[in-house]
Amino acid sequence: MTPTRPSVVVSFSEAGWRRFLAADRPRPNLLIVCASVEMEAVVSRVMSLCQGPVHARQLPGELSLPEELTGTLVLWDVAQLTRGQQMFLHDWITVRPPDAQVISVTTAPLLPLVEDGQFLEGLFYRINVVSLVARLGEGRADSQADTRSDMERQHAGSARFRTR
């Protein structure tokens, strides 16, 4: 059976994004799939919108996470994690402190990697997939009409997530 995960569609207006990041405890883990967008711009913008301390890790590289982490951990590019790093992150997310939130950014769709056994299925299901509907890296240029149209298309489509 092919694993599927429905996308959560988010309007990336600053006010909407702040409300989404300030969700009820425990705060959700997020995966932002951003094809055709500069990943650094997305990471920079997400970090500027997060409340509280922000810890950033560029991957691949050493993945060391403090046990007492609070605030937001931003990881990029999560598709490049080694199998050992995936297992470490999965275990950390499972018992993470309630005040910590993990936001991962990638340009590679993870579902094909899960299907090929290159990405840990358990970690994939612990990350909520968020499709990039607006141009987060381009500031306030997103329009409500475009976002509404994208949301309607997403909800009318299949349950598999898509990169945009």
Please place each PLM-identified region on the residue numbering.
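AAA+ ATPase active-site-proximal loops
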Residues: T2-L113, A134-R164
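Charged helix-capping and loop-helix junction motifs
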Residues: E115-F119
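ABC-type ATPase nucleotide-binding domain
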Residues: R126, V130
